Amino acid sequence: MIDLKQLRENPQAFGDRLRRRGGDFDLDRILELDAQQRQLEQQRSQLQARSNEIGALVGKKIKSGIAPTDPEIQALKAEANALKQKLSDLEPQERQLKEELESLLLTIPNPPSETTPIGRDETDNVEVRRWGEEYKPTYPCQPHWDIGTRLGLWDVERSVKVAQSRFVTLLGLGAALERALIQFMLDSHRERGYVEVLPPLLVNTASLTGTGQLPKFAEESFRCADDDLWLIPTAEVPVTNLYRDEILAADQLPIYHCAYTPCFRREAGSYGKDTRGLIRLHQFNKVELVKFVHPETSAAEHEALVADAEFILQALKLPYRVIELCTGDLGFAAMKCYDLEVWLPAAGCYREISSCSNFGDFQARRAKIRFKGAKHKGTQFVHTLNGSGLAVGRTMAAILENYQQPDGTVRVPEVLQPYLKCSHIGGAKS
């Protein structure tokens, strides 16, 4: 959620920064509702103060020996009753204003950071760096969906029978490779200081609202018909909300968590895109990295988060590039974001495999995650960050394509061989 105080104090500058995303946002209506709400709060405060004053005055007069039936006492009590009615009459007005204001605030995205490149869409994103040499074999290069089918790593047709399209059942070494990747990613992140979490796969509406998926992306999520529960689109949601409505001690920060979960997305707007393979599924596995940090270290923690995701790609020796998203391509809740894109030789292009976002205090305001330190009076909102470390299915796709051999086998990356107990998939060595 945006900082309403910032908008109130400098609406022009705030609006200019927000409009770098593109689109039109009704900030004037928010300011109007905010002013009305503050006016009602002031009115309530004045009425309550007078009510308290009358209560004290009546008590003092009765204590001095004046009878409760005295006309002066009766007049004060009548005024007190009138004030009580006025306070009661304010409640529905305040409630309606609060609901409308909060509803509007939930639709406003996070303003981009000052260092985010300005642009309209993904064509204006900025390449930051590349790692590794693009694999371009001299022999015919198969796409991962053909490799996986040929080697018996999954069964798509039966998955459609069991569920529908965009689901896959992994088999044999396909299932083993997926499991090996998950374990390797978790082991690596734990060694780098992350505390592993195994969270619920179903969350309530408040959790999805806290991280920014609701109300904007309700159509992208799977919802249980009879309960206030949703299947998670990413582990970011349950892990971030572990600390919802909490005040942390400053010395608890930073908090680093890693989590493996299946993720579920309807992909409502992707009809006809990536219909084959592991790139775009309704259910997929992902290892997520989530950080809760002090605002002063937020930018440095973001760069470190990107490095942690890059570590997995480098350990697997998969070529990739780092892209900084422009203002027009930022996710709803992010103020700054880097995408890691892995090289897929069959397609001859890079595809996103991790998105590492700094949300500033945007999610923390929605989820009410604060901290209290000795140097500051009151509480402050933490900064939250998260990134994929990595999307497991897309990592498998990249391995199958980048490690395919002329004899039709797939060489297993060295770091995964202890997990799989083999050096190749397919052929005599598997």
Curated annotation (Swiss-Prot):
This is Serine--tRNA ligase. The gene is serS. The keyword Transcription does not apply. Gene3D superfamilies: Bira Bifunctional Protein, Domain 2 (3.30.930.10), Serine-tRNA synthetase, tRNA binding domain (1.10.287.40). Consists of two distinct domains, a catalytic core and a N-terminal extension that is involved in tRNA binding. Pathway: Aminoacyl-tRNA biosynthesis; selenocysteinyl-tRNA(Sec) biosynthesis; L-seryl-tRNA(Sec) from L-serine and tRNA(Sec): step 1/1. SUPFAM superfamilies: Class II aaRS and biotin synthetases (SSF55681), tRNA-binding arm (SSF46589). Pfam families: Seryl_tRNA_N, tRNA-synt_2b. Keywords: Aminoacyl-tRNA synthetase, ATP-binding, Cytoplasm, Ligase, Nucleotide-binding, Protein biosynthesis. One of its GO terms (cellular component) is cytoplasm. One of its GO terms (molecular function) is serine-tRNA ligase activity. GO terms for biological process: selenocysteine biosynthetic process; seryl-tRNA aminoacylation. Homodimer. The tRNA molecule binds across the dimer. It is found in: Cytoplasm.
